[in-house]
Amino acid sequence: MGQFTVVSLGLLAVFLSLSGAKGDNCPANWISRNGVCNKLFPDRKTWLEAEMYCRALKPGCHLASLHRDSDSTVLAWYISDHFKGAGHVWIGLRDTNRKRTWKWSDRTSTNYFSWNQGEPNNVQDNENCVHPWAPSGYLKWNDEPCASLHPFICQYKL
């Protein structure tokens, strides 16, 4: 009877891990945040190249979208703690029509902004993509030309 119990518990553990039991099931090297998985990629890409890279990883994966202060804080900590010297990092916010109408690449609601003072400033009418600003500890955002090369954060929902 004891051996049966051990085997049964072992099979239950395997089943739960494979079936996505309640909890955070982000892959190794990804972090969990409010029901999504995030990973910073150190490769420097344009905003569009980064978005296409994220989309190719997994259905529903995009550059990260942030919807509250806690989202910004978690990602700022992650970038600062694990990727010192990464510089600016692309997130999924962009002004696709160049009319100062900001939208997330995953099409979630644009209900939260964390602009650095004086931003967005659209220098030379060419800053249509967004990154957390390194000098702010990645807590405040800056608009920048989409052709700039930066590391980036991909995100998908659990």
UniProtKB/Swiss-Prot annotation:
Keyword Signal (UniProt): yes
Similarity-based family: Belongs to the true venom lectin family.
Classification via SMART domains: CLECT (SM00034)
Gene3D superfamilies: Mannose-Binding Protein A, subunit A
Function noted in UniProt: Mannose-binding lectin which recognizes specific carbohydrate structures and agglutinates a variety of animal cells by binding to cell-surface glycoproteins and glycolipids. May be a calcium-dependent lectin.
Tissue: Expressed by the venom gland.
Listed InterPro entries: C-type_lectin-like, C-type_lectin-like/link_sf, C-type_lectin/snaclec_domain, C-type_lectin_CS, CTDL_fold
Domain of life of the organism encoding this protein: Eukaryota
Cross-referenced PANTHER family: MANNOSE, PHOSPHOLIPASE, LECTIN RECEPTOR RELATED
Compartment annotation: Secreted
Disulphide bonds in the chain: 26-37, 54-154, 129-146
Annotated protein name in UniProt: C-type lectin lectoxin-Enh7
Keywords: Calcium, Disulfide bond, Hemagglutinin, Lectin, Metal-binding, Secreted, Signal, Toxin
Coiled-coil segments on the chain, per record: none
Domain C-type lectin: 33-155
Molecular-function GO term, any one: metal ion binding
Range of residues in the leader sequence: 1-23
Record bears the keyword Hydrolase: no
SUPFAM superfamilies noted in UniProt: C-type lectin-like
Mannose-binding (motif): residue ranges: 119-121
Residues involved in Ca(2+) binding: 127, 142-143
GO CC aspect terms: extracellular region
